[in-house]
UniProtKB/Swiss-Prot annotation:
The gene is Osbp2. Pfam families: Oxysterol_BP, PH. The modification Phosphoserine is found at S284. It comes from the Eukaryota. Belongs to the OSBP family. One of its GO terms (molecular function) is cholesterol binding. This is Oxysterol-binding protein 2. It is found in: Membrane; Cytoplasmic vesicle, Secretory vesicle, Acrosome. The keyword Transport applies. Residues 81-90 have a biased composition (Polar residues). Residues 424-437 have a biased composition (Low complexity). It is a peripheral membrane protein. Residues 179-271 form the PH domain.
């Protein structure tokens, strides 16, 4: 081995070492017992070095030289490399910034030998990739005072040294660099004129960069290679071939040992880069956008990540040991089969090199195991305390749930035993008197929601008056008087049922919902306070419709708007628009399942011009936050558009869903333009009891042409209320503030309107307005659910048809989403697998867009939206609300007619 190695500066045999990228051990020649540096600087054209005064020594006793020798080093070497200095110091207890070469040298005083301690200049300091793992040959980290626990498997005549990185022949001690980092000089092929030129290469973070010299690192990088997509192999004894598809790089190291250092470092860096790429998430749960976890959880996650990295290091070392062990075994087999004495020298050299490499790698594996064990022992007690705390919290939570269940049952029994039971709905409504005051329920906890009574402008009492008492009701500006006894009254509820002109037969049922039991609390308990759209949920809690289809389902009672087109009075038209806005909540009373979060770029069309007289298009225009744009055109003379962003929070006992964004409705003939927003939905009994949903909050509908207004109030349900559940009340007033109609009903059943004939202040001292009205007229009534609806997710007749397969739709349509289709067919396990695939595909697409934005391919607005541009909608300034909103820019229905969908992305 020593005979075949390049000559060292001292003129002796250069000891060879080959191993992991972190390990640059100076191995003495086995024949002459002189220590050789790990790299020959003359290979790069450096000047000749002085010959160190190293004396030959006698063969030591046959024992492993793994003991720490703490005697002082007495004699310095005569000369050292330029840029370094030679000192003579006693051996410290822990390895510092110098590299030492020491051993048991027979014949020297006290068993010590004069060696050269070389201090590298800062610009020559290079990281040793496996220093943190292979730190005991024997080396300890500067911040650690642990004594190495393993023996170095060195042969007789080998000296034990600290780990450093050879740079032009200089051994430099590093401080715990990462496993996938390395740098040094390599020869790079340039062209046939200049041939191989010396370049400075730096490996880190999965990237290999090179410079002409170290001084260029601060300002000029010649090229950067991404190792995750790079293939590399060895050419000859010192050559390295790198190929990333676009270019091929031919490199040469100074020796086989240095070449092996680089190959091993490249293998580690590539493996880590691929692991990082696979573990990154953006998901319907993007990891890089997740809310910050509590401090304890953050520390635990960091510890687990560190242990995982250590385990990956062990796995990599194990693979390398197996690889080098197999190569060593093959060499030994070849050695046994040799018969010609002339071949023995070359084969013995190969066997010696591989045996040395195997010993070094084995040592690295042992020390990596030691580091992993030490880290695990350090955190074991902390984990035990955390486990005990979690167990105590679980017991406390179970006790709390038991108390809540008892209170729940007690309240239900008390409510059922109340004399007379809950009051039934009537034609007389007293607003604000049924609300529970805080003083009467001071025992409620801090999570209880309190709703104040409406302001005086909307707090009222209605008194029904017979029609014959109405002589000549007053009419405000811009309004007309309606004859309530007329058979053709536009607000006559009997004429509100849509005509059945459907020419296409639609499906009336879907496969029954499978009876899979899954505890919602088991998933949600760790998500308190988080955004609901960022919580990864299995399809078990979904319904086989996307959010785009749920948004389209609001058009089920479109005939209310068709009827409103014919209204000559703007306040009468406002009544129908208000009833339409309330009707969109009627499908939610039993629909506690969560719709699918649409993929970014997903669309849904509803082309029902023949039977419903409208065309509807939805597109998911943003993923975080989830936002959908919607546009509807009706042949009856109205258009509706909106951009809805869903904000949702899990509060422990309930889930709040807050749709953000304005809804626009315009009638082309009259020019009336209505704008309103949605109310807040709340899902109760997340912890215990049956899930139920409620609507709460105020809605103001404004006609921006006439300035008419409608104030709607969704009354939250309360055990202590004597009013009907799910109640909605409202008042329609003109631009002068004069009230014309009173609205009443429930959002899950029906809405009525009563014309006001007289108003006066209340005589009971509460300062509430008393409205004297005519008998109520029916505005809207909910359609009955289809037969067997309880087994079909409580879908309405329209909802059953929304996911029905149709020809000619865009390839991004929700009907073509595979996980949603599998769930509808009852194959939930396959649907969960497919859902994970789609989410990972979406995360990959987002990373690519971010890379393009980083490269400067888009404007500022495009960068803020991670580079995605909607296909059928575009951002515009809404002149009425002053907000930026996505509005339909056209082109979809023309593309459908041409059957040209080449511009659609592949999202499924």
């Amino acid at each position: 081995m020593g005979k075949a190695a390049a000559l060292s500066r001292g003129g002796g045999c250069a000891g060879r070492s080959r191993g992991l990228s972190s390990l640059f051990t100076v191995v003495p020649c086995l024949s002459c017992h002189t220590a050789a540096p790990g790299m020959n600087s003359s290979a790069f054209g450096s000047g000749p070095a002085s010959k160190p005064q190293l004396q030959p020594v006698q063969a030591p006793e046959r024992e492993l030289l793994s003991k720490q020798v703490c005697q002082p080093i007495s004699e310095p070497a005569s000369r050292s490399e330029p840029g370094s200095q030679t000192t003579s110091v006693p051996r410290p207890s822990g390895v510092g910034q110098e590299s030492e070469l020491q051993g048991l040298w027979p014949g020297s005083e006290n068993g010590t030998r004069s060696v050269s301690i070389i201090k590298a200049s800062p610009e020559l300091a290079m990281p040793s990739p496996l220093q943190s793992t292979v730190g005991s040959l024997p080396v300890t980290k500067p911040e650690s005072k642990l004594v190495p626990k393993t023996q170095s498997f060195l042969r007789q005549g080998q000296a034990k040294i600290s780990v450093g990185t050879p740079v032009s022949g200089i051994g430099v001690q590093m401080v715990s660099p990462p496993l996938d980092s390395y740098k040094g000089w390599l020869l790079k092929w340039t062209n046939y004129l200049k041939g191989y030129q010396r370049r400075w290469f730096v490996l880190g973070n999965g990237l290999l960069s090179y410079y002409r010299n170290q001084g260029e690192m601060a300002h000029t990088c010649r090229a950067t290679i991404n190792l995750a997509s790079t293939h590399f192999e060895t050419e000859d004894s010192c050559g390295i071939l790198l190929c990333n598809g676009a270019r091929t790089y031919h490199l040469k190291a100074s020796s086989e040992v240095d070449r092996q250092h680089w190959i091993t470092a490249l293998e580690l860096a590539k493996a880590k880069a691929i692991r990082v790429m696979k573990t990154q998430s953006d998901d319907s749960g993007d990891d890089d956008e997740e809310p910050a976890a509590p401090a304890d959880n953050s520390e635990l996650h960091h510890t687990l990540k560190t242990l995982s990295l250590k385990l990956n290091d062990l796995s990599t070392c194990n693979d390398l040991i197996a690889k080098h062990g197999a190569a060593l075994q093959r060499s030994l087999n070849e050695l046994d089969s040799l018969k010609i004495p002339s071949e023995c020298g070359e084969k013995l050299k190969v066997v010696n090199e591989r045996a040395t490499l195997f010993r070094i790698t084995s040592n690295a594996m042992i020390n990596a195991c030691r580091d992993f064990l030490e880290l695990a022992e350090t955190h074991s007690r902390k984990w035990q305390r955390a486990l005990n705390y979690e167990q105590e919290q679980r017991v406390h939570l179970e006790e709390t749930i038991e108390q809540l269940a008892k209170q729940h049952n007690s309240l239900e029994r008390a409510f059922c035993n109340t004399p007379g039971g809950p009051a039934s709905s009537s034609k007389s409504f007293s607003e604000g008197s049924f609300l529970t005051s805080k003083g009467e329920n001071s025992e409620e906890d801090e999570d209880t929601e309190y709703f104040d009574a409406m302001e005086d402008s909307t707090s009222f009492i209605t008194v029904v008056t017979e029609a014959k008492e109405d002589r000549k009701p007053e009419s405000g500006p811009g309004t007309t008087t309606v004859d309530w006894t007329s058979a053709d009254n536009v607000l006559d509820g009997a004429s509100f049922m849509p005509k059945n002109s459907c020419k296409v037969k639609r499906r009336v049922r879907i496969p029954d919902k499978p009876n899979y039991s899954l505890n919602l609390w088991s998933i949600m308990k760790n998500c308190i306070g988080r955004e609901l759209s960022r919580i990864p949920m299995p399809v078990n809690f979904n319904e086989p419709l996307s959010m785009l289809q749920r948004l389209t389902e609001d058009l089920e009672y479109h005939h209310l708007l068709d009827k409103a087109v014919n209204c000559t009075s703007s306040v009468e038209q406002m009544c129908l628009v208000a009833a339409f806005s309330v009707s969109s909540y009627s499908t939610t009373v039993h629909r506690i399942a969560k719709p699918f979060n649409p993929m970014l770029g997903e669309t849904f069309e509803l082309d029902r011009m023949e039977d419903m007289g409208l065309r509807s298009l939805c597109e998911q225009v943003s993923h975080h936050p989830p936002s959908a744009a919607h546009h509807v055109f009706s042949k009856h003379g109205w258009s509706l558009w909106q951009e809805i962003t869903i904000a949702s929070k899990f509060r422990g006992k309930y889930i709040s869903i807050m749709p953000l964004g304005a809804i626009h409705l315009e009638f082309q003939a009259s020019g009336n333009h209505y704008v309103w927003r949605k109310s807040t939905s709340t899902v109760h009994n997340i912890i215990v009891g049956k899930l139920w949903i409620d609507q709460s909050g105020d809605i103001e509908i404004v006609n921006h042409k006439t300035k008419d207004r409608c104030q709607l109030k969704f009354v939250p349900y309360s055990y202590f209320s004597k009013e009907a559940a799910r109640k909605v009340t409202g008042v329609v007033s003109d631009s002068q503030g004069k009230a014309h109609y009173v609205l009443s009903g429930s959002w899950d059943d029906q809405m009525e309107c009563s014309k006001i004939v007289h108003s006066s202040p209340s005589s009971d001292g509460r300062q509430k307005t008393v409205y004297q009205t005519l008998p109520a007229k029916l505005l809207w009534r909910k359609y009955p659910l289809p037969e067997n609806a309880e087994n079909m997710y409580y879908f309405s007749e329209l909802a059953l048809t929304l996911n029905e397969q149709e020809d000619g739709v865009a390839p991004t349509d929700s009907r073509l989403r595979p996980d949603q289709r599998l769930m509808e067919r009852g194959r939930w396990d396959e649907a969960n697998t497919e859902k994970q695939r789609l989410e990972e595909k979406q995360r990959l697409s987002r990373r690519r867009r971010l890379e393009s934005c980083t490269a400067g391919c888009g404007g500022e607005e495009e960068k803020e939206s991670d580079g995605y541009v909607p296909l059928w909608f575009e951002k515009r300034l809404d002149p009425l609300t002053g907000e930026m909103a996505c509005m339909y820019k056209g082109g979809y229905w023309e593309a459908k007619e041409k059957k040209d969908w080449h511009m659609c992305p592949n999202i499924f």
